[in-house]
């Protein structure tokens, strides 16, 4: 939905669109940015790779005041416009959904990736909800090393990585029978966890919540989830980029 809205708004603004995929790799991201700039693009919308350090190419664009807008991941401390979701507030609300229903032993599930600003905000929101209930979020119940959903692993290891992760999750679930619910930071992780719960016959006992859901024509979803307005994020990012291309040098953050 986001990509489609970006393309449509580019048409509305009189722009053509080029797509470059980094597959979650920082070197590919750097190469892609360099290639686009060599081709003479007027501006770039980028969903940055998951890495604790920012790409030098992105920092270079900021220094040079090249028109660029980031989506999904905010680059804190870097003067680049961002369009996305208030991840901390959304995570807090989703965690409170479970807490309001009596679930106290929630397993927080995240990929094996550097804690980007978006991921940090989701962790902070989760912990804040627990603190508001006078509780402590037990990180020993967290699953933090899933690789199958990361583009680099998915591209090169595919089913083998997924099988390894499922085995790891099943073992973790069996080791921690006290866990009563699961909070996944993305939909694909929620699907993996649900598959493991189903194999153990626990899918009805332990609810799974997540960020985002699957796209389908009837708007059905397997899980209670935070739904980001991907269409608006996409179109707004193009409008802000268009303003920058036309000379507006104000750095904007839109949540």
Model-derived features with residue positions:
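Alpha-helical recognition/docking segments in bacterial nutrient-uptake
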Residues: 1-96, 100, 174-178, 188
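Flexible loop/turn connectors
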Residues: 170-255
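Alpha-helix capping/helix-boundary segments
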Residues: 51, 114, 122, 188-190
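Short beta-strand elements in bilobed, periplasmic/extracellular small-molecule ligand-binding domains
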Residues: 11-21, 127-160
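Hydrophobic alpha-helical segments within soluble ligand-binding/sensing domains
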Residues: 81-108, 124-128, 162-170, 190, ...
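Secondary-structure junction motif
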Residues: 108-128, 149-153
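Short acidic capping loops at alpha-helix termini that bridge into adjacent secondary structure
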Residues: 105, 137-140, 201-208
